[in-house]
Amino acid sequence: MALSMASIKVAPAFGKSNLATRKSSPAPRRGSVTVKALKQNASVKHDSYNEHHGPEYFKYSGVDTTPDERQRRHTYYDKRTAIINQHFPGSIGMDDWLFRIENKLGEFGFTGDNTIAQTNFCRDEITAPLKNGIHDIFGYAMDIDGLAGFTAAGLTGLGAGMSHSPTDPNGRERYVFFAMPHIAVDSAGKPGDCIRAGRAGCSHACGALIKLQPKFQELKSGGMQIRAPGTCDHMDPEYSLLEARMLSAVQPADVPQGGLDLVQVTKLADSVIQKHMEELVRASVDPSKCDFAIVTGVQIHSYGHTLDEWHPNMEYVQPTRMTIVVNGQRTDVNLVEETPAPTPRQLWKL
């Protein structure tokens, strides 16, 4: 059952509205690469997080194989993408997303030379590939991360990042705020499951949102006491804040009888994070002195579902909102519909 989002109040707009709104073959074929199944995940290098890409990258990487092999490879990656889109429609590969983000922001004057990025992702280390991609575009970002992508940096944190921005000769500054929760959806399509480098067996993401899941059933039954706004557990501050924000975002009557599944919780988190980020930006940014953008979505980790078969670890993003304000003029961008995708060759070269 879909969750009603009617209780989530949409933040007022910034500026004036301008809506631009497999298994490896037993014997290798000539010209192909044989990949052996990994039996013991704990033997994987911990820094392998830097090697993840989206599906289009992997499609092109086998350009030296036979046509039949190439077709099988493309079919495999298309199936992986279809699995992700069953849960998060409109999702695209991480490389694809980064390419489009850089191009679209460049159209509005945001570049690595004149802009500072602020990243609000989950503290989980598997969010690193996406963050590294943003660093490649804008240089090192101001880190305002929090559990599940719920920042606790507040106005002081955002203000610190803005004070580090490059400045034009006329004194104008530019900021891009990235904010999103994350979720694992393994290669078989099971939400929440992933395999981590250096750790044998199955792991999960996002752990904070998985911990939160049962609370919605408690809320539905009337047995959940929501923490008062502005208060937190001093021994568990970030989780207690995200729990209060999430549970306050829905009415008990809107929660399905069986509670919320992890995909629903993640989508709700995206909505709540959007609202909170817009509130922070509105309270801290002066559009007369700077240009800025807010980019939200869901980061999705598509890793293998078994250690007995080889399945490449891939990263996806479901874009949900992109708001750009330049000289006080607001533009809402549909990233997928309005920004051309890179060619496979471009992705591979990048």
Where in the sequence are the language-model features?
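N-terminal chloroplast transit peptides
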Residues: 1-27
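N-terminal mitochondrial targeting presequences
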Residues: 1-6, 29-51
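Sterically constrained small-residue positions within well-ordered secondary structures
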Residues: 26-28, 110, 135
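Divalent-metal-activated hydrolytic enzyme cores
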Residues: 41-116, 122-124, 139-141, 147-175, ...
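Short N-terminal binding/cap micro-motifs at the start of the first secondary-structure element
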Residues: 127-129
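Short Gly/aromatic-enriched secondary-structure transition segments
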Residues: 132-140
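N-terminal, polar/Ser/Thr-rich
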Residues: 177-179
